[in-house]
């Protein structure tokens, strides 16, 4: 890392005591003293309290590219660290980059691949043009669709942020919008964060709240929308989160329940039982640390089409449809790859090649090269890869 012109050697943190790690941070110009950190942020924090600037503006001011101790590295530095990471005692197994759909293009995705990114989170928020415009989201559904298409061809996992109760939205519209996200071939994210809009003092939404042009959904409306979304979610999509990390004291009006997901899933369970339609969403079916007999598991291939790929979601499931592990196999349409190669030049894959975008087996994480009896150590991941290889060869 480049810290003010001084080259600081990288330390193997796994074999250093706390004092040595603290010394390393000090040398790099990174304070770890709580009082020092509080003083550095005090003025910006006060401006946020007074509504003079937003949290995002304060973060840019404190940690943006012009901040004096900002660290930099070349792509060669990154590549060397990737090599070290392969055999490290504590490995980084994924890098997630969050961005906007209109910032996703071949150039930016090529850089993200070079950085080692494995998943892209994009702020979709809505697919309704009226709602997007009302909330000053300067992206169109077409741009969002193009972002998903490119992410798939580059082999990334896609993680969409989606919001309910935005300015201009209604509960029925929100539910319909989400169904489009998870059923229209142009979108189909691998993961979703469903965030109810929160009213925070100092934001532009306060004026609409004051004049009555926006109101927070009541609990029945909000839980109804989110439960409908859970039921609409296909078996290859995971709802990773359902609430933002705002303290209840910062929320002027609207949902303040920290257990909102519990409430929503209880309602979704009731509706699923009434309609005899099981919940397919991944997180609802995860085995996590539960014990499983290997003989009870079945390998199921859920195949689906997107706008530019043929996808196979391979999953190990119990007789109750609980999920012990899964793999995402992507078979890009050859003509889509060839078209991008013609217009963009170099491309990460060739026509006819397949990609495994994700492999995940549930259970306790074991030490590298260690053994165990949970799902991760029974060859489930290897069997998923072998089956994916067979499908790709036969395609």
Give the label of every model feature segment:
Residues 147, 229, 388:
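Aromatic/hydrophobic pocket-lining residues that form π-stacking "cages" and hydrophobic walls in ligand
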Residues 1-159, 163-220, 224, 374-378:
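Conserved non-cysteine loop/helix-boundary elements of the Radical SAM core domain that shape
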Residues 96, 119-123, 191-195, 238-240, ...:
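Structured core elements
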């Amino acid at each position: 890392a480049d810290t003010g012109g001084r080259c600081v050697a990288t330390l193997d943190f796994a074999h250093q005591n706390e004092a040595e790690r603290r010394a390393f941070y000090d040398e790099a110009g990174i304070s770890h003293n709580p009082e020092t950190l509080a003083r550095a942020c005090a003025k910006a924090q006060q401006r946020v309290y007074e509504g003079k600037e937003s949290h995002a503006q304060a973060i840019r001011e404190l940690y943006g590219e012009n901040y004096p101790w900002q660290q930099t590295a070349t792509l060669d530095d990154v590549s060397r660290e990737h090599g070290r990471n392969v055999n490290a005692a504590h490995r980084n197994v994924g890098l997630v980059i969050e961005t906007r759909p209109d910032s996703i293009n071949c150039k930016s995705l090529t850089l993200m691949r070079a950085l080692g990114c494995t998943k892209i989170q994009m702020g979709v928020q809505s697919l309704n043009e009226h709602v997007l415009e009302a909330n000053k989201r300067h992206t169109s559904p077409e741009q969002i669709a193009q972002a998903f298409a490119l992410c798939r061809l580059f082999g990334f996992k896609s993680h969409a942020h989606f919001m309910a109760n935005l300015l201009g939205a209604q509960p029925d519209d929100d539910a319909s919008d989400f169904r489009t996200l998870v059923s229209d071939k142009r979108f189909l994210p691998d993961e979703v964060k469903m965030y109810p809009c929160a009213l925070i003092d100092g934001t532009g939404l306060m004026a609409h709240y004051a004049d009555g042009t926006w109101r927070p959904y009541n609990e029945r409306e909000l839980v109804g929308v989110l439960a409908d979304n859970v039921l609409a979610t296909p078996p290859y999509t995971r709802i990773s989160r359902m609430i933002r990390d705002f303290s209840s004291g910062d929320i002027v009006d609207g949902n303040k329940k920290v257990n909102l997901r519990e409430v929503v899933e209880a309602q979704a369970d009731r509706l699923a039982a009434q309609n005899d339609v099981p919940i397919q969403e991944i997180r609802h079916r995860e085995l996590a640390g539960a014990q499983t007999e290997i003989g009870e598991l079945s390998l199921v291939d859920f195949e689906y089409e997107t706008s530019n790929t043929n996808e196979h979601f391979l999953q190990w499931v119990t007789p109750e449809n609980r999920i012990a592990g899964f793999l995402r196999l992507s078979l890009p349409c050859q003509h889509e790859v060839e078209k991008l190669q013609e217009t963009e030049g170099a491309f990460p894959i060739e026509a006819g090649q397949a990609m495994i975008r994700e492999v995940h087996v549930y259970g306790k994480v074991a030490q590298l090269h260690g053994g165990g009896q949970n799902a991760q150590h029974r060859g489930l991941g290897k069997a998923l890869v072998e089956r994916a290889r067979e499908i790709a060869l036969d395609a």
